[in-house]
């Protein structure tokens, strides 16, 4: 997808990596050197020399570090629909091995990784969390279509299920993140940070939209107001 592809392309420039998607048509497209989302150019795809693509789950058995970037939509009642996350966790559980690390990037509520995803991994794999396998959370900050803010120059929050795994996850992301990383003290802190980021942006947009309606009735140029207000330092 538009979140996972830029990430896996960058990793493919550094280490052997498998880009997995359940849709064979998408895999065939990427193998041909094209990306219909236009997030990654044919030239960038070609530069990722250690990247392979697959829709075959068995091809993930040789992997030891998994990054999950599935969407988290809402249902008809406007509640988080974690079905894609659960299904992805079930798939990984089938190929999970001793010592593997699973990192989630999808937007979730604080606690979701450990409450919803980890139990699925344990049930399907038969392995024990923080004994046989480990987890992390590193919220995606991709802005689709933005050619200025790319994967490598956006600071990345990382976290892990133990202090040692947190260090390891941070090291892995630092392979590709030129802007640096911020290692959160826990998975829940990283999850909560993502919620705050999204909430702050939505609240700001809603506030300005409301103010713009008022300014319009007062014949005041909203853009001029924002430019003036933006001169304050805090």
Each PLM stretch: what is its role?
Residues 1-234:
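Structural/interface elements that position substrates and couple domains in central-metabolism enzymes
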């Amino acid at each position: 997808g538009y979140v996972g592809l830029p990430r896996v392309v960058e990793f493919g420039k550094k280490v052997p990596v498998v880009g997995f998607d359940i849709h064979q048509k998408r895999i065939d497209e990427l193998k041909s050197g094209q990306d219909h989302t236009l997030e990654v150019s044919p030239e960038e795809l070609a530069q990722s020399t250690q990247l392979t693509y697959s829709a075959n789950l068995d091809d993930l058995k040789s992997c030891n570090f998994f990054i999950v970037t599935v969407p988290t939509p809402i249902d008809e009642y406007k509640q988080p629909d974690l079905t894609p996350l659960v299904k992805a966790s079930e798939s990984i559980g089938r190929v999970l091995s001793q010592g593997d690390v699973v990192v989630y990037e999808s937007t979730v509520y604080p606690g979701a990784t450990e409450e919803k995803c980890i139990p699925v991994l344990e049930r399907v794999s038969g392995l024990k969390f923080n004994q046989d396998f480990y987890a992390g959370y590193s919220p995606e900050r991709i802005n689709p279509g933005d050619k200025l803010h790319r994967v490598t120059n956006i600071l990345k929050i990382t976290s892990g299920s133990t202090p040692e795994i947190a260090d390891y996850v941070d090291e892995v992301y630092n392979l590709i993140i030129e802007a640096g990383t911020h290692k959160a003290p826990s998975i829940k802190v990283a999850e909560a940070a993502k919620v705050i980021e999204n909430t702050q942006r939505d609240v700001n947009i809603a506030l300005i939209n409301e103010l713009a309606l008022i300014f319009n009735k007062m014949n005041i140029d909203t853009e001029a107001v924002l430019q003036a207000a933006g001169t304050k330092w805090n």
